[in-house]
Amino acid sequence: MFGFDPSLITFTIYIFGMLLIGVLAYYYTNNLSDYILGGRRLGSFVTAMSAGASDMSGWLLMGLPGAVYLSGLVEGWIAIGLTIGAYFNWLLVAGRLRVYTELNNNALTLPEYFHNRFGSSHKLLKLVSATIILVFLTIYCASGVVAGAKLFQNIFSVEYSTALWYGAAATIAYTFIGGFLAVSWTDTIQATLMIFALILTPVFVLLSFADTAQFSAVLEQAEAAVNKDFTDLFTSTTPLGLLSLAAWGLGYFGQPHILARFMAADSVKSLIKARRISMGWMVLCLAGAIGIGLFAIPYFFANPAIAGTVNREPEQVFIELAKLLFNPWIAGILLSAILAAVMSTLSAQLLISSSSITEDFYKGFIRPNASEKELVWLGRIMVLVIAALAIWIAQDENSKVLKLVEFAWAGFGSAFGPVVLFSLFWKRMTSSGAMAGMLVGAVTVFAWKEVVPADTDWFKVYEMIPGFAFASLAIIVISLLSNKPEQDILNTFDKAEKAYKEAK
């Protein structure tokens, strides 16, 4: 297993490269602001690539291609919804959140921003929001651990229980050492590696056919064999089903690990440039992932002898294509892209979870006067604790990356998405409204499948839709029933809005 294996050598070089960046970032990390937000000094390119890489986890190279391989282009509605959601997140939220968090006592985390934005005399809002982050991000981290474990299990033929630790170890190490700067710098490299793999692989799958006519003919045979039209965007679904797939885009407004990239940018103007870079990267990556899943259908239909692994485990489709179509050295680089996707998102989520405990729980409730050095080291220790919990959740070998991501994505989108949007655009919003929105959104996501009868179409609706809608309604109703915010809060809101418009 550990002889002269080009894939192993490539992986090792890649991991050591990431660790080296972590060590370099260590020397730029002097205080908690550096560890959590990199001192708010990220440029447009790093912001764009870091936001993209921390967003598109192992789901991009495993979950989405696997879903398309299994069901066809109808799964592309997820990509359509995500693209629209990401664009409006950059357009509506990015610049405002950068300005508003800085003017609200230089808030370093979402819970701290909510607390400062609404001027709560008590810290219950911070406590509830930090708890929601820990619950859903730990589940989200588990999806990254599962993706990494399946990669190591496939490549090196080790037991899943062993692969869990291999997949998580490198990510934990450079996040522990370097904090936000390490995560952002490595994200930039990893985003480049991901787009390289996602463009190259579908092209080589197509080139494996004599011409497009042969490709089309084999695809038609594959469709006839299962009586399914893989190229139909509307096949085997309902309007509610399509809405559920497209509703993934709503989740962007509430993802802490993505919003942190906006907060860390050096200026609003750099965010405008970053939006163009990030959206271009995202469209190419999603198109490549869909292409991998779709083109793999006729490829493996024409080669049934090598299709066993993919037919049993569709999420392995990219891994199998990389191993089959490329020499071991190139395959090792391409497969490192999966590790890159896993590491980039997992590291971002570990850091947000760690900062939530350090800044919002420890400094907020236990030791308000803790030194910067103490807080940074506590943050590092919390990275280890959250990672251990994620590994424990990921113990089930049958866990699906897409399902874990789907649940956590809905949780954040419903609990935080409406609160973030209303906090930036409606100054009449109150702390009671924010609290109601968070709780209603989070509870809806957990309760939807338990309350709605399984034999109805509503059971199949993605939890994001009712969660986002009910949370928004709760914010409006409770805010209007509450006393108006204090004048200082209204003045800060106006000041932030003015600063944002001047900074554009």
Swiss-Prot record:
Keywords: Amino-acid transport, Cell inner membrane, Cell membrane, Ion transport, Membrane, Sodium, Sodium transport, Symport, Transmembrane, Transmembrane helix, Transport. It is found in: Cell inner membrane. It comes from the Bacteria. Its main location: membrane. CDD domains: SLC5sbd_PutP (cd11475). Pfam families: SSF (PF00474). The keyword Repressor does not apply. It catalyses: L-proline(in) + Na(+)(in) = L-proline(out) + Na(+)(out). Coiled coil: none annotated. Gene3D superfamilies: Sodium/glucose cotransporter. One of its GO terms (cellular component) is plasma membrane. GO terms for biological process: proline transport; transmembrane transport. One of its GO terms (molecular function) is L-proline transmembrane transporter activity. Belongs to the sodium:solute symporter (SSF) (TC 2.A.21) family. PANTHER family: SODIUM/PROLINE SYMPORTER-RELATED, SODIUM_PROLINE SYMPORTER. Catalyzes the sodium-dependent uptake of extracellular L-proline. This is Sodium/proline symporter. It comes from Haemophilus influenzae (strain ATCC 51907 / DSM 11121 / KW20 / Rd). The gene is putP.
